[in-house]
């Protein structure tokens, strides 16, 4: 007989009265009054199997099965008795009366209960094979698969061609650290694993393929966080002869269709916000628009106040002073407690802030006397009036302040905005709206100044085109040069980022010069690109989405590791296979590598 006729989770009333053959794992075995019930599980879900003692051989086998045994069942689909249906399961109105039961493979006792929702991540990743059997992980990975299929079908209909690019390439250490692969054949030389197929896809446009995509692995040797992995999956796309707006329109439509099909969610319109506006209002280039709090700009107001923390920042080159109004934060009942304010003060220090000044607005009608804060006495009446006017403060509001270098203020108060918005207080007081909030952030700076290296560096990458009319600023004022770059943001996460690329060799050389790359360095690192651009390179641009992030958002997973089958930990380790691991001396000799501290490598 066939090993299986149907998936467990797909056995429904439509199969009533039919004989089915199922294969899967014992999720649970229950003995009720001489009748054994087995919940049989596969990737599609569970089905209840009833083992009656009338069939002695089968029943004896059923008595011996335990959780996670791999078994095969042949039986009759019938309705569950009245009062025993389970509408939470597709198969919840039927059961399978077992005629034959075969143990395909027994299981040792698992190290944890499969329905335990409080497992540590270490336990889950160490026993990942078992963890992947759990419905939570199977739902996540099935959604990932269905999303990838839909993306492929969409791009195929739009004329995009799936072309693979090399995994072993040239190291160009301009951004994050590369993962390096030593060459056995070429002593002392190294390949790099791709951080992105960026230059290959641009050269495919020069080669005339017009529209390219691939769903591919990329690698970055960087410090890991909840939304980072050393290897990650990218939906990588490039297209020729389209402008920025046309490129954005294609991929907005793609994401909109994915959410509608997979989640039945209508994302609606995508507002377009400039980078400058996003940083000014929210302190972030990926604002979470679900949080209903915004910065109030106060730099000019604070230039002549006696409170040196404010006036010092306001008069500092590159300094900024802002307020964050928290409606209801100072209410006598239901406002933020002193302990919560102290906790927020410590929180902003993580982002470089030295502290967190605040004013409680108790009674506006009393003017200065209606405000509660140790800083009020050092702020003159005109500044107080302007603070209250600009923030729109009402009785019971709490005003937090950030004053420092612009980056510190944006990072610290931006993080505080999210912390308060997502808190229990924020949700109870209407500061958070539980919706999907997409937007495009556009007009990014072309360059940012790296104080450690004392030079300008590319904000996105050095192949991004400057906005029309901004090319000359690369020579005169790089900080004011804007790029044809755009990010798709959803709920505070960057889903995808891209740009119109430079397609003229002389402009590309100009960017390299602005980055303090000598012509010799530029040719050594990127000569193949500069050469390609001279052969009639078309205007082109593209975008790359992080598939892992996209699925994390769609599933509501707490960590990106919950949507990847075999992820690395935050220490870049695979706990299942114990990678990375030492290699033997012969392998190292073949690669012309000698370890400085071999004992440390063995002990790691």
Curated annotation (Swiss-Prot):
Q: What is its main location?
A: cytoplasm
Question: PROSITE patterns from the entry?
Answer: AA_TRNA_LIGASE_II
EC numbers for this chain: 6.1.1.23
Primary role = Aspartyl-tRNA synthetase with relaxed tRNA specificity since it is able to aspartylate not only its cognate tRNA(Asp) but also tRNA(Asn). Reaction proceeds in two steps: L-aspartate is first activated by ATP to form Asp-AMP and then transferred to the acceptor end of tRNA(Asp/Asn).
Q: Provide the assembly information.
A: Homodimer.
Q: Which gene encodes it?
A: aspS
Q: Name one GO biological process term.
A: aspartyl-tRNA aminoacylation
Q: Which UniProt keywords apply?
A: Aminoacyl-tRNA synthetase, ATP-binding, Cytoplasm, Ligase, Nucleotide-binding, Protein biosynthesis
Q: List the record's Gene Ontology CC terms alphabetically.
A: cytoplasm
Species, as recorded: Paracidovorax citrulli (strain AAC00-1)
Superkingdom assignment: Bacteria
- Chain sites annotated for binding L-aspartate: 174, 220, 460, 501
Q: Show the PANTHER family listed in the entry.
A: ASPARTATE--TRNA LIGASE, MITOCHONDRIAL (PTHR22594:SF5), ASPARTYL/LYSYL-TRNA SYNTHETASE (PTHR22594)
Q: Where in the cell is it found?
A: Cytoplasm
What is its EC class? ligase
Looking at the UniProt record, the site noted as Important for tRNA non-discrimination sits at 32, 83
Concerning InterPro entries, the annotation shows: Aa-tRNA-synt_II, aa-tRNA-synth_II, aa-tRNA-synth_II/BPL/LPL, Asp-tRNA-ligase_1, Asp-tRNA-ligase_1_N, Asp/Asn-tRNA-synth_IIb, AspRS_core, GAD-like_sf
Specify the protein name. Aspartate--tRNA(Asp/Asn) ligase
GO MF, one term, reads: nucleic acid binding
NCBIfam families tied to this protein? aspS_bact, PRK00476.1
Q: Which reaction does it catalyse?
A: tRNA(Asx) + L-aspartate + ATP = L-aspartyl-tRNA(Asx) + AMP + diphosphate
């Amino acid at each position: 007989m066939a090993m299986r006729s149907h998936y467990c989770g797909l056995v429904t009333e439509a199969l009533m009265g039919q004989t089915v053959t199922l294969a899967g794992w014992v999720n649970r075995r229950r003995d009720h009054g001489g009748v054994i019930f087995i919940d049989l599980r596969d990737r599609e879900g569970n089905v209840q199997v009833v083992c009656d003692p009338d069939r002695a051989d089968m029943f004896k086998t059923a008595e011996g099965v335990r959780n996670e045994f791999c078994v095969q069942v042949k039986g009759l689909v019938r309705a569950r008795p009245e009062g025993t249906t389970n509408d939470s399961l597709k198969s919840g109105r039927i059961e399978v009366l077992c005629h034959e039961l075969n143990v395909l493979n027994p299981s040792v006792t698992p190290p944890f209960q499969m329905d335990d929702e409080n497992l540590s991540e270490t336990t889950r990743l160490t026993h990942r094979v078992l963890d992947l059997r759990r419905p939570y992980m199977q739902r996540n990975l099935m959604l990932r698969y269905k999303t990838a299929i839909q993306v492929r079908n969409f791009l195929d209909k739009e004329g995009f061609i799936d072309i693979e690019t090399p995994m072993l390439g040239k190291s160009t250490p301009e951004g994050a650290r590369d993962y390096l692969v030593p060459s056995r054949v070429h002593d002392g030389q190294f390949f790099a694993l791709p951080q992105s197929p960026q230059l290959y896809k641009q050269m495919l446009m020069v080669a005339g393929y017009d529209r390219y995509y691939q769903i591919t692995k990329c690698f970055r040797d960087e410090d890991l966080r909840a939304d980072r992995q050393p290897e990650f999956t990218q939906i990588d796309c490039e297209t020729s002869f389209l402008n920025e707006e046309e490129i954005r329109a294609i991929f907005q439509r793609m994401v909109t269709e994915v959410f509608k099909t997979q989640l039945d969610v209508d994302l609606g319109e995508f507002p377009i916000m400039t980078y400058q506006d996003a940083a000014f209002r929210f302190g972030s280039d990926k604002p979470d628009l679900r949080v209903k709090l915004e910065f109030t700009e106060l730099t000019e107001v604070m230039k002549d106040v006696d409170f040196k923390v404010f006036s010092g920042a306001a008069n500092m080159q590159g300094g900024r002073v802002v307020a964050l109004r928290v409606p209801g934060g100072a209410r006598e009942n239901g406002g933020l407690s002193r302990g919560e304010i102290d906790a927020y003060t410590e929180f902003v220090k993580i982002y470089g802030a030295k502290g967190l000044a605040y004013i409680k607005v108790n009674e506006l009608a009393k003017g200065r006397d209606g405000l509660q804060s140790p800083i009020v006495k050092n702020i003159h009446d005109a500044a107080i009036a302007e603070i209250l006017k600009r923030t729109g403060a009402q009785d019971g509001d709490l005003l937090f302040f950030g004053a420092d270098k612009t980056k510190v203020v944006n990072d610290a108060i931006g993080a505080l905005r999210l912390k308060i918005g997502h808190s229990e207080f924020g949700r109870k007081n209407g500061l958070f709206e539980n919706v999907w909030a997409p937007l495009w952030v556009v007009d990014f700076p072309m360059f940012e100044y790296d104080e450690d290296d004392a030079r300008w560096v590319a904000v996105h990458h050095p192949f991004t085109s400057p906005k029309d009319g901004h090319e000359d600023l690369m020579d005169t004022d790089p900080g004011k040069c804007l790029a044809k770059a755009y990010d798709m943001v959803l709920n505070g996460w960057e889903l995808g980022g891209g740009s119109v690329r430079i397609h003229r060799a002389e402009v590309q050389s100009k960017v390299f010069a602005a980055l303090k790359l000598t012509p010799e360095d530029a040719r050594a690192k990127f000569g193949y690109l500069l050469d390609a651009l001279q052969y009639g390179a078309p205007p082109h641009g593209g975008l790359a989405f992080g598939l892992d992030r996209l699925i994390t958002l769609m599933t509501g997973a707490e960590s990106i590791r919950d949507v990847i089958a075999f992820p690395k930990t935050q220490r870049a380790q695979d706990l299942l296979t114990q990678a990375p691991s030492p290699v033997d001396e012969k392998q190292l000799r073949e690669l012309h590598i000698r370890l400085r501290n071999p004992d440390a490598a063995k002990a790691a």
